[in-house]
Swiss-Prot record:
Keyword Ribonucleoprotein: yes
NCBIfam families: S15_bact
Domain of life of the native organism: Bacteria
Lineage of the species this protein comes from: Bacteria, Pseudomonadati, Pseudomonadota, Gammaproteobacteria, Pasteurellales
Molecular function GO terms recorded: rRNA binding; structural constituent of ribosome
UniProt keyword annotation of Kinase present: no
GO biological process, one term: translation
GO annotation, cellular component aspect: cytosolic small ribosomal subunit
Keywords: Ribonucleoprotein, Ribosomal protein, RNA-binding, rRNA-binding
Family per record: Belongs to the universal ribosomal protein uS15 family.
Organism annotation: Haemophilus influenzae (strain PittEE)
Cross-referenced Pfam families: Ribosomal_S15 (PF00312)
The protein's name: Small ribosomal subunit protein uS15
Amino acid sequence: MSLSTEKKAAIVAEFGRDAKDTGSSEVQIALLTAQINHLQAHFAEHKKDHHGRRGLLRMVSRRRKLLDYLKRTDLALYQSTIARLGLRRLIFYYDSKKSSPRILRAFLWGCTR
């Protein structure tokens, strides 16, 4: 279940710094996002494809690591990339009373719970 060459080239042209830039973090994240979206449609129809689901989880984990790297190195590029891809972002903050990190969701999605 891979993307066609034309789709990959269009993603590289949109997110890359030039036409042959396939190694930058934002291009890799965009390619993984397209593959993940494609596989989610596949799993809506094939619910018992557990072997493929394992590969999907691996892709999601790899994208998360690339997003963490991009956030650490270039915050402005990270924010523009997730805005262009339509991804959610989680902001962790440390509560002064507890040592465990909490997720600040109300700021991001407007939800109150």
